[in-house]
């Protein structure tokens, strides 16, 4: 899980979701998981 100021989709499997007001990117590739901080 990377914490970034701007989260972007990296590949076609990345999905941007909003959980409890936090924007996250979830993906089957574990390296692509991100959270906005």
Curated annotation (Swiss-Prot):
Tree of life domain: Bacteria
Could you list the residue ranges forming a coiled coil in this record?
none
Biological processes annotated in GO: translation
- In the record, what terms sit under GO molecular function? structural constituent of ribosome
The record's keywords, sorted A to Z, are:
Ribonucleoprotein, Ribosomal protein
Q: Which GO terms describe its cellular component?
A: cytoplasm; ribonucleoprotein complex; ribosome
Could you say which protein family the record assigns here? Belongs to the bacterial ribosomal protein bL36 family.
**PANTHER family named among the record's database cross-references:** 50S RIBOSOMAL PROTEIN L36, CHLOROPLASTIC, LARGE RIBOSOMAL SUBUNIT PROTEIN BL36C
Q: What NCBIfam families is this protein classified in? A: rpmJ_bact
UniProt protein name: Large ribosomal subunit protein bL36
